[in-house]
């Protein structure tokens, strides 16, 4: 789960990158870096606020609207899933906090499963 503003946003700002992703037939999946209304780490929360987005998985979905096909969100934020789906974004709810290798593998698998789901 990367900061959608400074990590992913800077990559998307490279000329042609966003357009290439939007034009691709490949499924695009993001993992929300916001859990329970707070950033997992780093400055994502104040940056989302500064740009007018809610500090939530829903705000992350709004930030990525039109770009992603699916968003992996934490179980804590499961109540937001229907709001995100209403934006046309598929949602996978799982534990997104990576405490060790097993959790990292499980989150990666959830993202892959989301990609397969939207590609089907």
Map each language-model feature to its residues:
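Conserved phosphate- and dinucleotide-binding cores of soluble alpha/beta proteins
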Residues: 5-63
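Hydrophobic, aromatic-enriched interface-forming segments
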Residues: 1-2
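C-terminal functional extensions of proteins
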Residues: 41-120
